[in-house]
Regions:
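Acidic, Ser/Thr- and proline-rich intrinsically disordered linker/docking segments
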Residues: 1-19, 23-131
Length: 131
């Protein structure tokens, strides 16, 4: 279980004060403009609690790719109107996905990704390779 360190988005900032177990990552995405930090990390068993860090989504994804396992990028689906700037790309850890299922006849088509902790995420079809 490899750990990687990031700078938690806080005021005031503190260096390397968030160490996460990469095996516990569900998915990663760029933070919404109304949140602190550049990147939001969703962890296993945390429910709606997220961890915002000051590093860019590219830096966080790159650090995750150096550890065992991989991430799969896809476009998030929103039931509500999309945020300004459009839909975000989410990077999902397939090892923590219990199943995926299509939601037809929704328009546009999307998939429901169910994680091992019972949480769910919707992604726009087609489902990317690796999920």
């Amino acid at each position: 279980m490899p750990f990687i360190a990031f700078n938690k988005a806080s005021d005031p900032a503190a260096p390397d004060d968030l160490r996460i177990n990469t095996d516990a990552v569900l998915y990663i995405e760029a933070s919404r403009p109304d949140l602190l930090g550049e990147t939001t990390i969703h962890l296993l068993g945390q429910g709606t609690v997220v961890h915002a860090v000051t590093e860019s989504v590219g830096t966080v994804v790159s650090a995750m790719m150096r550890s065992p396992g991989s991430l799969v990028g896809c476009t998030r689906h929103y039931l509500a109107p999309q945020p300004e700037g459009g839909a975000s790309t989410v990077y999902i850890a397939p090892a923590n996905v219990s199943y995926t299922r299509p939601n037809h006849p929704a328009s546009p088509d999307f998939w429901v990704v169910r994680f091992v902790d019972g949480s769910e995420l919707r992604v726009i079809a087609p489902l990317p390779e690796g999920l």
